[in-house]
Amino acid sequence: PEGVRDVYGKECAQKLELNQRLHQVLLNYGYEDIETPTFEYFEVFSQKVGTIPSKDLYKFFDREGNTLVLRPDVTPSIARCVAKYFSEEKVGIRLCYAGNVYLNNSSYQQKLKETCQLGAELVNDDSAQADSEIIAMAVDCFLTSGLHDFRISIGEVEFFQGLTASIEDDEIKNQLREFILNKNYFGLMEYVENLDIPENIKQVFLRFSELNGDVAILDQAEEMVDNKISKKAIARLRKVYEILKLYGKEKYVGFDLGMLNRHNYYTGIIFKGYTYGTGDAVLKGGRYDNLIEQFGKKAPSVGFAIVLDELMTALQRQEIPMEAESV
């Protein structure tokens, strides 16, 4: 079928070896393995949880008529697990996984609908230190794969929330969000010009495309906003950057305050990892402080997932040998 492929021979061996090396990075950071089912009840990935639109899920029924779904994303499954098996835990829980995910999305022409992801989740920790640990670990995964020319681009969901907090019309908020999600800044400028919103907020949206670059962007953004929520988001990014300097990873990161994610469960910092040779982000992650609560446990968390198939494509196109050195 369209969107799936066989992996065999040398490529299969390389994929297994790459998976093993990246897995070792996660273990070295003190993360423990977790496995969740390939399919779950539909409710685990419902719109209420904030994952993938229902039309993009592979759905089927069991004998009792329950709707089941091939997982499009591992994080909600882990959230369900944590609420069930770690309900009394108060200290940080470090979990890592590898597994296939499935997206039935027609816009993914020429893209795989079944991909292999490797990732990690740090649960029960709402600190900037947790955000930094996850990003530093993501950098180490890239370095261990053999990549050196890459960038982790970091944003903050609350920056956008602060800007739109005073806008009462949900339709306007959704339209602004859609323009920014698609990086359609010309469309955004045209749309904002005709909106009846405060002039200072309008000016930020008109200059949204500029809010992408190195750490100096944070100073520029702070001068542009005057609401507490956006300013707090910028302060959080600064703190994360300072901690990443202690890890020695700051040269691999940049900032994009125009970054949003289609997964609505993200609540704070979000980030994506880019390199040459692949059209999409190889790595995606962020903070989701309310997701596990949907399953019955209040547990602020942060995590990421690497799309192994995309990473292998990038390594091949950059002619990086799969047997790369460790960090």
Predicted feature residues:
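Short, conserved phosphate-binding/catalytic loop or strand-edge motifs used
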Residues: 113-118, 154-162
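Positively charged, Gly/Ser-enriched RNA/tRNA-binding surfaces
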Residues: 11-29, 40-43, 75-88, 94-147, ...
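TRNA-binding/sensing appendages of the translation machinery
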Residues: 1-76, 132, 153
